């Protein structure tokens, strides 16, 4: 199964204003252009089946989405908001926050893993961790560039794993420096009379 990241997008304006839809569409295309992204699903990709008065068969064959020009945005938004399938999946219950699901391309697996040395396996794991870290930094840059259009937050297992590793490395450095300073202070206190 593919890993994924989740963004939450709360626009400064209403969710279905032209501005908010254009910003969400722009954000989607920007994320989709990243080399490591497989697909991006947003509120704008949800099929609308109750948005027209056409026969059901016709609506199923050529369904519309909120990004289509000839769609009643408010009616479509209400349909998604009242849908038991999509409510709390791509839209919050109050309709103010939208979810963006980013599926990550699978990284080439290590073939014949049982025939590989521990060193080769560790190099492979390090390569994956480094790539994941670079991906997280890249998506955070994209989020930062859209900071003026609303509140955007990042989540998902790859992001949590990367943040944990970053925090642990930082904590080790801080703890190491603290221990070093403690040892120096202790040695100075014990041997200060000799100096």
Give the label of every model feature segment:
Residues 2, 53-56, 91-96:
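Flexible hinge/switch segments at interdomain interfaces of large molecular machines
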Residues 30-40, 49, 66-70, 110, ...:
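Short helix C-cap/helix-to-loop transition motifs enriched in small/turn-promoting residues
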Residues 17-20, 53, 112-113:
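Short, glycine/acidic-enriched capping/hinge loops at junctions between secondary-structure elements
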Residues 1-48:
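Extracytoplasmic/periplasmic
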Residues 67-194:
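Extracytoplasmic
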Residues 46-51, 160-162:
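A short acidic, often aromatic-flanked loop/helix-cap motif at beta-alpha or helix-coil junctions
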Residues 4-6, 53-56, 61-69, 117-120, ...:
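Generic detector of short, locally flexible boundary/turn motifs and exposed helical patches
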